[in-house]
Amino acid sequence: MAYDIISDIHGCYDEMIALMQKLGYEVKDGTPVHSEDRTLVFAGDLTDRGPKSVEVMRFVAKAYEKGAVRYVPGNHCNKLYRYLKGNPVKVMHGLETTAAELKELSPADRTEVSRQFIRLYESAPLYDILHNGDLVVAHAGIKADDIGKYSRKVKEFVLYGDITGETHPDGRPVRRDWAAAYEGKAWIVYGHTPVKRPRIVNRTINIDTGCVFGNQLTGFRFPEHETVSVESSMPYDASRFREDHGRQA
């Protein structure tokens, strides 16, 4: 089995479809199908900030229920899940756009989409170990020693990265560069922190190329170790991208 991993779609449905087509998938009855033995893996943060979060939710949930794709959650997925379950969350940092889309639906459609996403989230693994352990897909990454573990500390790392507890002036959390110290044998494919180009450090690759911030949506082909990207239709926001340190794909 070969895999095509996509991360941080953030409601950019049109770019998601374009990238799938570029990767060789054809959508049949709402399900992505490849002529070769390949499977799509979504690495979290399906929604928020972009224009079509509900469409992304519907598409991934339906395909996942059919067993056609794999999915692991991101921090935005976690927050949306808690919001849909009625837990108290701050409707900000992008969630407000998804909430607004949901409110535009009829009550019946809103209930259906919410239930679809809740089922998706509750049935998904925290991270995915694939290809006989040679590949791990985790939204914000994972340390080599934590692969196979599922503690609260590991969950926080996988969803939010290696946060220090400090914040940047704009409110974003300060994160350590865990990839620079990674010495594991498995390839870790992750996103979460926008970079202008896919960032390869040791056996890790960050494929969040900031589609929702006007750059690109990127897929990583494994075991080929190739990246495929499509351009974003969103306005470009240079302030959202971290400095690149490491080899660019």
From Swiss-Prot:
Cofactor(s) for this UniProt protein: Ni(2+)
Listed Gene3D superfamilies: 3.60.21.10
One CC-aspect GO term: cytoplasm
GO terms of molecular function: bis(5'-nucleosyl)-tetraphosphatase (asymmetrical) activity; GTP binding; nickel cation binding; phosphatase activity
UniProt-listed InterPro entries: Ap4A_hydrolase, Bis(5'-nucleosyl)-tetraP_PrpE, Calcineurin-like_PHP_ApaH, Metallo-depent_PP-like, MPP_PrpE-like
Catalysed conversion reaction: P(1),P(4)-bis(5'-guanosyl) tetraphosphate + H2O = GMP + GTP + 2 H(+)
Keywords: GTP-binding, Hydrolase, Nickel, Nucleotide-binding
Any Pfam family: Metallophos
SUPFAM superfamilies tied to this protein: Metallo-dependent phosphatases (SSF56300)
Protein family membership: Belongs to the PrpE family.
Function of the protein: Asymmetrically hydrolyzes Ap4p to yield AMP and ATP.
The protein's name: Bis(5'-nucleosyl)-tetraphosphatase PrpE [asymmetrical]
Organism ancestry: Bacteria, Bacillati, Bacillota, Bacilli, Bacillales
GN (gene name): prpE
